[in-house]
Amino acid sequence: MPKISVIVPIYNAEKYLERCVKSLIAQTFHDIEILLIDDGSTDASSMLCARLKKEDSRIRILHKPNGGLSSARNAGLLAASGAFIGFVDADDTVSPTFFETLLQKIEQYHCDFVFCDLIRIESGKPPTLRSASLHGGYYDKRKIKRCVFPQLIMRDDLEYGPLLSVCVCLYRTSFLKEHDLRFDETVRYSEDNLFSACAGYRAASFFYLKGQGLYEYHRNPGSITTTHKADAWESYKRMHQKLCALFQNCPEYDFSRQLDLHIIHYACAALGGVCALPKVEQKSKIDRILNDEALKRALQNRPVRHIPFKLAIQLLCMQYRCTPLMCLWLQRREHYA
């Protein structure tokens, strides 16, 4: 049985898949299984998986009908046999010491998960280190409640909390099983937000390797994060409803402010996507978002602090549902991301 199971969900990733898998094959820690989950790809990804498997016996392939990223990751969780589990997206890469470094920390501190920073790589721009809004080091339950719970879901400045991407993490398999932590397959975008909030809430301890950008996030043209998603708002609302069900009446901490900030954040994200639509379609899309009752309550209840001036203007337009002004504003501003 391998020490680490690495789950790689794949959908039409032929351009980048070999680069990703080669970075896994090159890991300095060798006792891993590489689970390639082909989520109904229609390009040459499945053939590429077969060729890569011939190069390394640690590769296992699972073909399934297309069900989305969460479905593919869940299939990987069911197939995984390692004591620890990691996730790597098919268009990303990891440094050679990624799993060796994370494993050393999770075993040293006997924690539920460990995570590091990522390097963002984008064509035409210098690589940038992305760090979490936490000090590095070991976090027990008391420290998690004090330092993480106040920003677990969303920060006051409308930025994500410190626990977001599952790809920078190594999880103890027994921890995931004990708390039945899986990905919600009804949430199609920002899947990590829901999973990571639950993991952070349930964890007895974790370790954060601050300043070590061992995961390499490649922002590729045409990826899911760079294109307009017509159903994004409905998916964001489903995620918000799931978070409310889990955290609205939490006995250990009052997450109500963060839940309001969460729907405001994703309304901004959905409105940013409206910029990509023809002008004739923008008004109806904006009206549908701004007239959402949960969003209206959140804008009334929770003044947002420490945000850029341009975003503050947008929030005022949203709060008073100034659709014509919102249309004009969206035509002039950069996408919120």
Residue ranges and their predicted role:
Residues S23, D38-M47, P65, D89:
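A conserved acidic beta->alpha catalytic loop
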Residues P2-S5, E33, L194:
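Cell-envelope/extracellular polymer assembly enzymes that use nucleotide-activated donors
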Residues L69, A90-D231:
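Donor-binding/catalytic cores of nucleotide-activated saccharide
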Residues K64-A80:
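Glycine-rich, basic loop-to-helix element that forms the pyrophosphate-binding segment
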Residues N12-A26:
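Short, well-formed alpha-helical segments that are part of the catalytic scaffolds
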Residues A245, A276-A337:
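Membrane-interface aromatic/basic loop that binds lipid-linked glycans or pyrophosphate carriers
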